[in-house]
Amino acid sequence: MTEQTSEATVVNNSPAPTIPKIKREKPTPEEIEERRKLKQLEVVPEGFSRKQWKRELKKQRWQDTKQEYLEVQREKKRLARQRKRERLKDLDENDELRKAQPIPSRQISTNNVSVIIDCDFDELMHEKEIVSLSNQIKACYSAMRHCTYKLPIQITSFNKRLKQRFEAQLHDYHLWQGNISFTDRSLTEYVTGAPNSESKDNDGNSNSNTTNSTDTINTENLVYLTADTDEEITKLEPNHTYIIGGIVDKNRHKQLCYNKAKELGIKVARLPIGKYIEMNGRHVLVTSHVYELLCKWFENDGDWETAFNKVLPPRKIKSKSPS
């Protein structure tokens, strides 16, 4: 019996595979000084400031090393999967470690609540802000995959630099699964019924889950979320679509989304941030946080405070009881 017990508790102690680190020698003070002198002598092309040229060189270096970086990241992920398989292969199916890794439910909200990300602000953003917005949309997709309640997303005004960014750097968005779609039509065109090219899903096909070129949206069921209003939402209404402004501008453009909503006859409202958390400055959240908060509201049975604390980084919030 003793021998059998010892055999049953054998654990694979073989060392985990690792990626050899590339050792780079630190430059000497003389080399650093030489580099500094070369930078001072460097000729900045016409039309560039020194700062802009430095940024351009950095972008070129990234393009030169991008493939190597991606290969290292893929290898890290492969090794992580391998380590996970080794940890789990000798464990029983009822082991606590397996129980601690549930697969998220594929349930979609039955209340017909959906989300539009209005990206019709391309000309108001700098290049870095376009990159940031594209990453936030990617974060929305990640939240959709992992949340229990997956609110459908439609990205409107998917064109210009934003689309170019996706096609160049995030081209696998065509393979995204779930109820997320992209259209070059603007929110204004949907509301007014102005014709444009047909909405496409991530496979480039006509998307039956979104309005086509002749459809309009009933503004009675639209709510534009903006911090520039005193009207707060207390719950997410069934059969309503909540619009998130797809813009990264460091608050340069005040009341931008508010004014657009008023022009289109769309109701405006803000999330009840002040009732549950305290934030420094204006109560403005990034696009991906707003989307995830809406999903978490359903997941936590309408508990805004729990949703805020689950989504926002602890360093940015301070719990506050409802008044």
Swiss-Prot record:
- Could you tell me which residue ranges the SAM-dependent MTase TRM10-type domain spans? 99-319
Show the segment(s) annotated as Disordered: 1-34, 192-215
User: Catalysed reaction per UniProt?
Assistant: guanosine(9) in tRNA + S-adenosyl-L-methionine = N(1)-methylguanosine(9) in tRNA + S-adenosyl-L-homocysteine + H(+)
Q: Keywords in alphabetical order, please.
A: Cytoplasm, Methyltransferase, Nucleus, S-adenosyl-L-methionine, Transferase, tRNA processing
Principal location class = cytoplasm
* Compositional bias of kind Low complexity: 204-215
* Positions in coiled-coil regions: none
Q: List GO terms (cellular component aspect).
A: cytoplasm; nucleus
The record's EC number reads: 2.1.1.221
This protein's source sits in the domain of life called Eukaryota
Where are stretches of biased composition, namely Polar residues? 1-16
The residue ranges flagged as biased composition, category Basic and acidic residues, are 25-34
Localization per Swiss-Prot or TrEMBL: Cytoplasm; Nucleus
One MF annotation (Gene Ontology) recorded for this entry: tRNA (guanosine(9)-N1)-methyltransferase activity
Positions contributing to S-adenosyl-L-methionine binding: 225-226, 245, 249-253, 257, 271, 283-285
User: Which biological process terms from the Gene Ontology are attached to this UniProt entry?
Assistant: tRNA N1-guanine methylation
InterPro entries, alphabetically? Answer: MT_TRM10-typ, MT_TRM10-typ_sf, TRM10/TRM10A, tRNA_m1G_MeTrfase_euk, tRNA_MeTrfase_TRMD/TRM10
Q: Which residues form the active site?
A: 249 (proton acceptor)
**Role:** S-adenosyl-L-methionine-dependent guanine N(1)-methyltransferase that catalyzes the formation of N(1)-methylguanine at position 9 (m1G9) in cytoplasmic tRNA.
Q: Which family does it belong to?
A: Belongs to the class IV-like SAM-binding methyltransferase superfamily. TRM10 family.
Q: How does it assemble?
A: Monomer.
What protein am I looking at?
Answer: tRNA (guanine(9)-N1)-methyltransferase
Taxonomic source organism: Candida albicans (strain SC5314 / ATCC MYA-2876)
- Give the gene name: TRM10
